[in-house]
């Protein structure tokens, strides 16, 4: 089994419910199990600010799937929950990002793992640190150190 960390985000159609539905859907992915779920956090949007705040979380999975097959399942979950890919950084019902996939480094047309912006985003670092406090991002460093550098003060823990 490979340890995988997934970033979840939503700011449309009752975001907390969207995240809960996505976690249940991830439990149905073949050869994959949900191990841990972080608390949910409210955060300001990245990009255009004329949209609702986001609700974010991180989930730890164990999987036997390849990263690309897992991505297919995650994108299917996004689509089932009404995800539309119209505007970069636009409002969305659901965003599921593979943050880390074991110790693999992947850089192709479909995937960049570790997720290319995760080290700059408090809304990823704080929930990731909550469920994986010893996390090291390959080529970047310890999540706990990055959190000290990043301003995660604007995050509000919801549940």
What are these regions (language model features)?
Residues 1-32, 38-44:
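N-terminal beta1-alpha1 ligand-phosphate binding loop
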Residues 14-18, 69, 135:
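Secondary-structure boundary/capping motif
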Residues 20-26, 70-77:
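Short amphipathic alpha-helices in soluble, non-transmembrane regions
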């Amino acid at each position: 089994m490979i340890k995988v960390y997934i970033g979840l985000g939503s700011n449309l159609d009752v975001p907390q419910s969207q995240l809960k539905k996505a976690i249940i859907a991830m439990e149905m992915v073949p050869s994959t199990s949900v191990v841990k779920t972080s608390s949910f956090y409210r955060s300001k949007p990245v990009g255009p600010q004329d949209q609702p705040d986001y609700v974010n979380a991180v989930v730890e999975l164990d999987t036997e799937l390849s990263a690309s097959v897992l991505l297919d399942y995650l994108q299917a979950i996004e689509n089932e929950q009404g995800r539309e890919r119209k505007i970069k950084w636009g409002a969305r019902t659901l965003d599921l990002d593979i943050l880390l996939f074991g110790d693999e480094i992947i850089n192709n047309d479909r995937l960049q793992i570790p997720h290319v912006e995760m080290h700059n985003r408090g809304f990823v670092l704080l929930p990731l640190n909550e469920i994986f406090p010893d996390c090291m991002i390959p080529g970047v460093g310890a999540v706990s150190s990055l959190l000290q550098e990043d301003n995660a003060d604007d995050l509000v823990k919801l549940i």
